[in-house]
Amino acid sequence: MAAKEVVFGNDARVRMLAGVNILANAVKVTLGPKGRNVVLDKSFGSPLITKDGVSVAKEIELEDKFENMGAQMVKEVASKANDAAGDGTTTATVLAQAIVVEGLKAVAAGMNPMDLKRGIDKAVIAAVAELKALSQPCADSKAIAQVATISANSDESIGEIIATAMEKVGKEGVITVEEGQALENELDVVEGMQFDRGYLSPYFINKPETGSVELDHPFVLLVDKKISNIRELLPILEGLAKTGKPLLIVAEDVEGEALATLVVNNMRGIVKVAAVKAPGFGDRRKAMLQDVAILTGGTVIAEEIGLELEKATLEDLGTAKRVVITKDNTTIIDGNGEQTQIAARVSQIKQQVEESTSDYDKEKLQERMAKLAGGVAVIKVGAATEVEMKEKKARVEDALHATRAAVEEGVVPGGGVALVRVASKIAEVEVLNEDQKHGVVIALRAMEAPLRQIATNAGEEASVVANTVKNGSGNFGYNAGNDTYGDMLEMGILDPTKVTRCALQFAASIAGLMITTEAMVAEIPQNASQDMGGMGGMGGMGGMM
C-alpha cells in the first residue's frame, strides 16, 4: 500500500479552498447573459467552446491532490444539479463557492463548524419553502419560450422552437435534439404513434410517388404470433370485404402463404390491406402491442390469454383516422381509443419510469409514454461549423431541461432575484446559539452571490447592483442583457423554480460538509525517476585464453 500524506486543520482547509476557487472561478465566468465562453482542449477532434457550467467543471483535474479534492467536491455540486434539473450548474457552483469561502473564514475565526453547518441547513430549508411560495405556474407558450430563451443564453430562436415543439407534442411528449445539416434550426414533429417497422412487402405500396402505403380510416388487427396460414385470417378478411374499409395487420411476422394471399388480394383490389411486423422484442413487444391496442381501441389477439385468430371478429379490431407506412416506419395517426384508457396507460407507464433503475429502460418507457400522449418532436440544430454546432446543441439541451423543470414546478423571477427576495424573508430563522446564527448569515450572504456574479460578468459594480435590487421589492431586478432595472417577469427573465431550488440544496449540502473538514488524506505522489533504479554497468569481459 502506498504511503499517504495527512494534513490537518487550517492547512487542510486552505488547500481545499484553493481547489474550490480554481474550479469555481473557471465556471462562474459563464454566468448570465454577458457571461463568457470557456475553451476546453480535447485529446481528439477540435477544442470545445462552451458556456455550460457542468461541461467546464467536468474537465478540471488538479495536480495537487488536496486542491483536487476541493475541486472534485464542487464538481459534484454541478453534476448533481445537472442530473436533477438539467440546468443551473453554474449557479450551484457559485453558491457552493460563496458558502465555502464565508464558512471557512468563520471556522478560522474560532466558530464551531458543526453549528455553522446546522445554521446553513436551517436557512436552506426555510429558503426552499419560500421559493415554492414565490413560484408561479408556467402554463402558456410565451412563458415556456421565455424560460428556454434565458437558458439558451438569450437566443430567442431556440426559445421559440422549444415552445413550438412543446405545444405540438404536449408536456409528456418526447423532444430530442440532433445535429442538423442546414445553417438554421429545424423542427420535425411526428404526430401520432410511430414505430420503426416498415411494410413487409413493397406490393402493398399504394402511393408510388412517395413509396409509401396510406390507409384512410383503417381497421387495425394486432396479433402476438407469426401468421403463416391464410385460413386463420379468412373470417376477418370476409368481414372486411363487406365493409369496404382497409386493414393494417401488426403481427410478430406474416410469411409464406398468408403474405402471398394478402398481396394478391390487395393488388386485385378485393381487400385493401398492409402488414407490418410488431415493434420491439420479447416482453417489450407485448407491451407495445398493448399500447397500440389501447390507442386504437382494439384487442391484442394472443393465445396466452385464450384468444384465437380464427375466432376473431371485427369487434376485436382497433380503428384509426389514418395510417402511413414507409420502408422503415409505421405511423398511426388519431387512433380511436378511449381517452380515459389512454390516460390510465400513460400514468401506468409513468409509474414504471419512476420504479425503473436502468437508464435504457427509462428512455424506452418515456418514448412509449410520448407516443401514447401526443407524439415525438426532433429539433435539428443548425450551425456553420462543427465547433459552433457542439456549443449550440449543448445550449438547446440545457434550454430543454430548463423548460421541462419550469413546467414541472413553475417559475420564479430570474437574474438571481428570487434568491435575494427569499433571503430577505428568512432572516429570522430560529437558532440555538450564535454560531448557528452565523451559519444562517453565511447562507443568506451566499444567496446574493449569483446576482453579484451576473453583474460582474456584465462589467458592472456588483455591490451597487446588489444594493439596488435589495432596496426594490417583488419582481424588481437587474437585466444584465440590456443594463436596465425593472420587473423581471414583465421583461421575460424567468428561472425554473426547480433549477433554483436544486442549485441551492446541492450547493449547501456539499459546501456545508466541506466546512466541517478537519483532516485530509491523500497518496504521496511518486516520481517516475525514483521508481526506476538505474541498471548497474556490466563488468568488462576477461581476456580469452
UniProtKB/Swiss-Prot annotation:
The keyword Chaperone applies. Its EC number is 5.6.1.7. InterPro entries: Chaperonin_Cpn60_CS (IPR018370), Cpn60/GroEL (IPR001844), Cpn60/GroEL/TCP-1 (IPR002423), GroEL-like_apical_dom_sf (IPR027409), GROEL-like_equatorial_sf (IPR027413), TCP-1-like_intermed_sf (IPR027410). It is found in: Cytoplasm. It comes from the Bacteria. PROSITE patterns: CHAPERONINS_CPN60 (PS00296). ATP binds at T30, L31, G32, P33, K51, D87, G88, T89, T90, T91, G415, D495. One of its GO terms (cellular component) is cytoplasm. The keyword Nucleotide-binding applies. GO terms for molecular function: ATP binding; ATP-dependent protein folding chaperone; isomerase activity; unfolded protein binding. It catalyses: ATP + H2O + a folded polypeptide = ADP + phosphate + an unfolded polypeptide. One of its GO terms (biological process) is protein refolding. Keywords: ATP-binding, Chaperone, Cytoplasm, Isomerase, Nucleotide-binding. Forms a cylinder of 14 subunits composed of two heptameric rings stacked back-to-back. Interacts with the co-chaperonin GroES. PANTHER family: 60 KDA HEAT SHOCK PROTEIN, MITOCHONDRIAL (PTHR45633). Together with its co-chaperonin GroES, plays an essential role in assisting protein folding. The GroEL-GroES system forms a nano-cage that allows encapsulation of the non-native substrate proteins and provides a physical environment optimized to promote and accelerate protein folding. Belongs to the chaperonin (HSP60) family. This is Chaperonin GroEL. It comes from Shewanella baltica (strain OS155 / ATCC BAA-1091).
